[in-house]
Amino acid sequence: LPIVVEISHRDVYREGLICNFFVRNVPLRFNPEQMTKYLEVSQTLKTKLGMFNFNFGILTNAAGRGDVNAIIGMRAVTGRKKLLFDAPQRLEAACKIINMHAEQKIIVFSETIDLCESIANAVKQGASRPVFVFHSQLTTDEKKNVIKEFGAIDNSVLCCVKALDEGMNVPSASVGIIASGSSTRRQFIQRLGRVIRGVKGKTAYLYQLYFEGTKDRDWLMSRTADMDATIYNI
C-alpha cells in the first residue's frame, strides 16, 4: 500500500496522541548447560540449512515433502525457539520488573502460552494485585471480559501472547514488558503502541528481555532498527 502520511513519534507526541516513553533493553544470560544446548541446536540448524542453500523457504518446503534432513532442520528451529522463549530467566526478570511498578497497569507480551501462563501464575503467588491472561485458547467472550476487567483496575497485570498485539485500547496501561519477541518490526510497534497512548502527565516504559550472545539479540536489533526513540541498554 502507498504511504499516505508519514510522521515521527516526536510529532505525534506534540499532538498529544502518545505520551513520553522510554524503551529499556534488559540483557539475560544462559547458564553453561543452557548455552551448550543452544549451541548444539544452532549447529544442527546451520548444517541442515546449508543442505538447502541456506534458504529457509526451500528448507520448509522440503520438510513438507517429508525430506528427513529438512525435518531435522525444522525441529532444530522449533527447539532453539523453545530454549530462548521459555527459559526461566525470562520469568524471573519479568517478575522483578512487575514488582518495580507496583502501582501501574502492566502488559506482559510473550511468544508462547507456556511463558505467558508461568509469569501470570508467579505474579499471582507473589503479589496482591489482579492478574489476567489473554491468549488464543480463550473464547471470544472470555477475551472480552479479560480486557474489560483489566482496563477497570489501576494496578492490574495482563499477560498475553500474540493475540493481543492488535486491536486493544487501554490508555491507562503505562508499562509493557516484551518477555519474548520476534524480529518483526510491526509486532514491536504494535506492542509499544499498547502502552504509549496519549494521557496527560503519563510516562510509559517498555522493557525488552533478550539473551546475550544468541539469535534473540539479533531479533531485538532487527525489530528496533532505525527507531526514532531513545533506547536504553541496561
PLM region descriptions:
Residues 111, 136, 181, 209-211:
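Cofactor-binding loop segments of dinucleotide-utilizing enzymes, especially the Rossmann-like FAD-
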Residues 1-103:
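Interdomain helical connector at the RecA1-RecA2 junction of SF1/SF2 helicase-like NTPases
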Residues 194-223:
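Conserved segment of the helicase C-terminal RecA-like domain
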Residues 105-109, 114-124, 128-165, 187:
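Conserved helicase ATPase core of P-loop NTP-dependent helicases/translocases
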Residues 32, 88, 113, 161-162, ...:
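Alpha-helix N-cap/helix-start capping motif
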Residues 1-3, 18-23, 127-130, 171-175, ...:
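Short glycine-/polar-rich loops that comprise or flank the Walker A/P-loop
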Residues 157-160, 166-182, 187-188, 203-209:
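A short beta-strand element within the Helicase C-terminal
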Residues 37, 187-191, 223:
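Alpha-helical scaffold elements adjacent to nucleotide-binding pockets in ATP/GTP-utilizing enzyme cores
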